[in-house]
């Protein structure tokens, strides 16, 4: 029994030892990390959360005070769902360009842009989608929304016809133009990281 307790304590210690860290800009709130809701105990000082090494999926919202007609107002974004790969013990930072007015916030809402970087300030490749929900949004079930998105994504992948393309024959420019904005961003970040 004693050996079992020691082994489980070591396993717990070693998993947090190799964990990656993600520091979020002050206004960014983590809602979901890898399918699970985030509790206050999981958010450490400086708005930092631990991530497992490997593939991660996080849903975040941005809440910021902006000006509208000379008055201060709180802007809350739709959830942004990011997917990326974190290396063991990697320190990552997620930021966005702050907005001053409600018009700036609406522009962000229509075309959200965030920056994921490593400790040296190099961009880290990621994909991002905005989980839009119309109507009143007082109490959102972020776990359910992410689970529904993942189920829909898996269903599309299962039903997509398999197409065999010769990678040498595909023109890179054409492929880039066919990508969504988020895919283009992720591709550019990957390309910058892999420059020779």
Swiss-Prot record:
Disulfide pattern: none
Name of the featured protein: UPF0319 protein VV1_0237
Keyword Signal: yes
Assigned protein family: Belongs to the UPF0319 family.
Alphabetic keyword roster: Signal
Pfam families assigned to the protein according to its UniProt record, in alphabetical order: DUF2057
Signal peptide: 1-19
UniProt source species: Vibrio vulnificus (strain CMCP6)
Top-level lineage group: Bacteria
Coiled-coil annotated spans: none
